[in-house]
Amino acid sequence: MKSFVVAPFIVAIDGPAASGKGTLARRIATHYGMPHLDTGLTYRAVAKALLDKGLPLDDEALATDAALSLDLLAMDKAVLSAHAIGEAASKVAVMPAVRRALVEAQRHFANALPSSVLDGRDIGTVVCPDAAIKLFVTASPEVRARRRFDEVLARGDTADFAEILADLKKRDERDMNRTDSPLRPAEDAHLLDASEMSIEAAFLAAKKLIDHALAQHRG
């Protein structure tokens, strides 16, 4: 009798900053009991490693060394969510060698597990192009800026809405126009516009797609 290996069931969720993809990914992971990796945190962790050592953010060799020694299980979302770290992360994220190192680590995470949920900017296109289900979550810049603004206020920090909106638009342009792994939906991705959709509505839409894909995966 022939033996065969069942491919891991991977849910790939992509989208621009503050689109709600992370919240949706966590909701899906919790519902299905799947391990979750926020790949954006990996870039933030590299940036923090450089900042902690007082190293320059524009040195690709140093940033790549930090990426290669990164422990995915040691990342602290609360610490890495700081605005300054996010700004620093956007600088190291454009470095091809850093992206290659982190993509390899992210891919290993997904392929080493029976099932997983990964969210980021290039999961369905680069990290896990063979993912069982691909979602691309988007929302208007204004809606995303309002969400980010509310998040900052909820943490007890001060924020300027116009500044956050300008930063998001700048990040969108950088993400979509970079030569290595630009932000774009995979050809077979399901689009979810969360501009006027609650997280629960987005989850229910995603759940319907995932349940169908799971049934096919299990045969």
Swiss-Prot record:
Q: Does the keyword ATP-binding apply?
A: yes
Q: What GO cellular component term, any one, is given?
A: cytoplasm
Gene3D superfamilies in the cross-refs? P-loop containing nucleotide triphosphate hydrolases
Question: Which cell locations does it reside in?
Answer: Cytoplasm
Q: Which transformation does this protein catalyse, written as a reaction?
A: CMP + ATP = CDP + ADP; dCMP + ATP = dCDP + ADP
A Gene Ontology molecular function term for this protein is:
dCMP kinase activity
The record's InterPro entries line, in alphabetical order, gives:
Cytidylate_kin (IPR003136), Cytidylate_kinase_dom (IPR011994), P-loop_NTPase (IPR027417)
Keywords, comma-separated and alphabetical = ATP-binding, Cytoplasm, Kinase, Nucleotide-binding, Transferase
| Alphabetized Pfam families for the sequence | Cytidylate_kin
Q: Could you say which residues bind ATP here? A: 15-23
Q: Which GO terms describe its biological process?
A: pyrimidine nucleotide metabolic process
Which E.C. number(s) belong to this protein? 2.7.4.25
Q: Which family does it belong to?
A: Belongs to the cytidylate kinase family. Type 1 subfamily.
Task: Report the protein name in the record.
Answer: Cytidylate kinase
Organism of derivation: Brucella abortus (strain 2308)
